[in-house]
Amino acid sequence: MDSPGEPSFPSGLLSGGASPSGDEGFFPFVLERRDSFLGGGPGPEEPEDLALQLQQKEKDLLLAAELGKMLLERNEELRRQLETLNTQHLEHEERLQQENHELRRGLAARGAEWEARAVELEGDVEALRAQLGEQRSERQDSGRERARALGELSEQNLRLSQQLAQASRTEQELQRELDTLRERCQTQALAGAELGARLESLQAENQMLQDRRQDLEAQIRGLREEVDKGQNRLQTTHEELLLLRRERKEHKLELERARFEAGEALRTLRGLQRRVSELEEESRLQDTEISGASLQTELAHSLDSDQDQDQQVNECGGSQAILSPETQETSSPQPSIQEEILEPPKKRASLSPVEILEEKEAEVARLQDEITLHRTELQTLRDELQRQKELRAQDNPEEALSSALSDRDEAVNKAMKLSLELSRVSLERDSLSRELLRAIRQKVALTQELEAWQDDMQVVIGQQLRSQRQKELSEAAAAPRRAKTRFSLRLGSGQSGGFLSNLFRRT
């Protein structure tokens, strides 16, 4: 007998009996520890330590607890699986019941239709029988007619049986059509889901394209604003050009005045030279007592002064001759500019904005060069007049001549410096004009790319709309065909019934 303090376990479990799944030896280690579970330790004759026995019992108890826990978890898992299987079974059973109910309802509807059809046929038969009775009462003597009527009735019965067989066949065909329609509905539902996903992708793509279009429109607006600014700049340059032309006219008038003053100065210079020659002759007559050496020196001095004066006069004449062709050259572009202004609008409209801008820039540059030349000419003439005035004011002609030569050298150096500065400025202006032309070409290229992109997007959207419309038309054309096949069977049965009724009425 076991002691009361020892744990009690099922006999099947401790004996290593059948497992929950039916397998033998599910827990083989229990048989090995059976004696320890049952408390059947060693006898008093076996010399073992009591502490080791207690430790062994504790280990066995822990193993038993773990085993019970595992069994409980296994039982819980099996219970959950059983519940899920029960729920699945119930759902499957409900679905089958619903389908059975729907099939029964369809069968009942078909039975009601066929019963109504049979009632109609029975009514026709009764009417035929009444007609047959009338014919029998009216034509009792005509046996051949009765035989013929009986033959017709037998034929009608045969036709009715054939119609019933045909009705059963049509019912089977309708059932098959119903199955095919269900399959088509499922396929259409799948196709609708695919179309919805595709529509969402197309909407996202359309939104992206609209955002890009808005960005490009903003760029176009910026480009248009820049073009407007360029046109405003062109208008301002045109106004500046008109102002420069007015200034050029004023400079021409000043040049004419300066030339007139230079002519007067030359005339006064010649008068002064004649006066000096007269004074020299008087001084020679008065100073006859002076030695030959002093006379020779005075003659040499007078000859040098005459040569210097002639050279100065020649330089003034050369400057006038140089100024006159330059003024002619500056005046010669005027008619060309006027001709360009008076040019017909058709020729100017045929040019591109870049070419017009280039022409305007060339005109402005040419006018600026002309203005600088006129200013330099005016400055030289003013300096020349100032020198002439100083020469007139001075008593010593040698100092005046030396100062005039030094001023001339300074003027030449200044002219060289100004020409170098003018060439540098013209180079800078050319580089700026090239940069401006490059920017305008980039703007034109961007506008062309934008127009090409808009055309491509319109083509893509049109193709997508056409493909979607063709799909809708094909689906709409397929639906009426199915309806035609369904209604043709029903109309065939109705027409046969009408033929029988007409035949009985004739008889």
UniProtKB/Swiss-Prot annotation:
Composition skew (Low complexity), residue ranges: 1-22
Keyword Transit peptide included in the entry's annotation: no
Coiled coil regions in record: 64-292, 354-459
Renumbered residue ranges of the record's region Disordered: 1-27, 324-349
Keywords recorded for this protein, A-Z: Coiled coil
InterPro entries linked to this entry: Spindly/BICDR_Dynein_Adapter
Polar residues bias: start-end ranges: 324-337
Family named by the database record: Belongs to the BICDR family.
Subunit structure as annotated in this protein's UniProt entry: Interacts with RAB13.
Protein name per its UniProtKB record: BICD family-like cargo adapter 2
Organism for this UniProt entry: Mus musculus
